[in-house]
Regions:
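C-terminal edge beta-strand
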Residues: 317-325
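Exoplasmic/lumenal beta-rich domain surfaces
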Residues: 79, 198-297
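Short, compositionally biased P/S/T/A/G/V-rich stretches that sit at domain boundaries
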Residues: 39-43, 135-178, 184-186, 190-197, ...
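Short, solvent-exposed loop/turn segments at the edges of extracellular beta-sandwich modules
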Residues: 311-315
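Residue-level recognition of secondary-structure-to-loop junctions
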Residues: 48, 109, 286, 296-300
Length: 327
């Protein structure tokens, strides 16, 4: 009986330990961090241009909500073939960043071959493995869905006809300024107006107000859209043409200041964030001529690569400018 009792006790303890482990594991997965975590490189898929050229698409997941990490091109931020430098970022923004850059697929590359991006941050090394498997092929509808403009598996003739916006920087591609000195750059954006901004009609707003009059919980959501519960389990993104400037490559630890503050190019889903992934966010107006000036200053000397992104909420176009900063 004593042996049976001990066995029962150990079985119960084992079951409790298993439940506790599951609880701790689930809790750990739900934790969020401002800093100290590593970055996972991500292979997003591959696409084929109209001329038949194939490209691998990459992004990353910075597990921090605030920390931006710099990793120079080399053994800790490099590729397995074709040279370590394939145009990847050296400055990594917080959280999820999708379809950040693409790498031309070598003409001799076969479906069984792999291109590996290795990234080491905070002492942890992770790799992304790119292949030409057919199930990894990506088109514009997939991009719009993955970034949050569409629900999974949804599309329309309008969405399928969407053309990515374009951006042109009205300055020479290489400039030299001093630390702390302001540089003004002007971007010009153009878009086809697709997808259309979701603006509630007057009739729908009136119906919503009538329902809210009889429902205190709904009334609170009308007063504060940030209190609205999520309508989807995947990331959601507001559509509407907007422009974002951000640092793509630069000296480690350097800070770049943009005036006015820029719309975030990374998936900041927190309420009140200046981000198309944030609840109740709306795109700021674009001037009729599509031109937007920005003042930029730098904290450290060195060579910087800045990106300017024109984003319609579903697709985007990037343009880069290189700035040399001296003391």
């Amino acid at each position: 009986m004593r042996i049976a009792h001990c066995g029962l006790r150990f079985a119960v303890c084992g079951a409790l330990a298993a439940v506790l482990a599951l609880h701790v594991g689930a809790r750990a997965q739900s934790l969020s961090y401002t800093k100290g975590q590593n970055i996972a490189p991500a292979y997003e898929g591959w696409e084929q241009a109209t001329d038949g050229t194939k490209y691998f698409l990459f992004g990353y997941m910075n597990r921090n909500w605030e920390e931006e990490i710099d990793v120079p091109v080399g053994p800790e931020n490099g590729f397995s073939i074709g040279g370590v430098d394939q145009g990847q970022p050296t400055h990594f923004l917080p959280r999820r960043n999708r379809f950040v850059f693409r790498v031309k697929v070598p003409p001799t590359f076969k479906e069984k071959d792999e291109l590996i991006w290795t990234l080491t941050t905070h002492g942890k090394t992770e790799k992304a493995y790119a292949t030409l498997r057919p199930d990894y092929i990506v088109d514009d509808v997939v991009k719009a869905s993955e970034t949050g403009a569409l629900g999974a598996g949804t599309s329309s003739p309008e969405v399928r006809g969407n053309i990515p916006p374009t951006v042109h920087i009205e300055e020479v591609k290489a400039r030299s300024v001093k630390v702390g000195e302001e540089l003004t750059l002007v971007s010009e954006v153009k878009d086809d107006g697709i997808p259309k901004r979701r603006v509630p009609s007057r009739a729908s707003l009136q119906r919503l107000q009538e329902r809210a009059a009889a429902d205190p919980a709904l009334a609170a959501q009308v007063r504060n859209p940030g209190m609205q519960p999520p309508t989807r389990i995947t990331v959601g993104k507001s559509v509407g043409l907007h422009v974002s400037w951000f640092l793509y490559r630069g000296p480690a630890g350097a800070k770049v200041t943009f005036d006015p503050p820029q719309v975030k190019a990374w998936e900041d889903t927190r309420a009140g964030a200046n981000s198309p992934w944030a609840p109740a966010w709306t795109a700021p107006p674009i001037p009729a001529d599509g031109k937007l000036p920005v003042k930029i200053s730098f904290s450290e000397p060195g060579t910087y690569v800045l990106r300017c992104r024109a984003d319609d909420g579903a697709l985007f176009g990037d343009e880069e400018v290189t700035i040399v900063v001296t003391k």
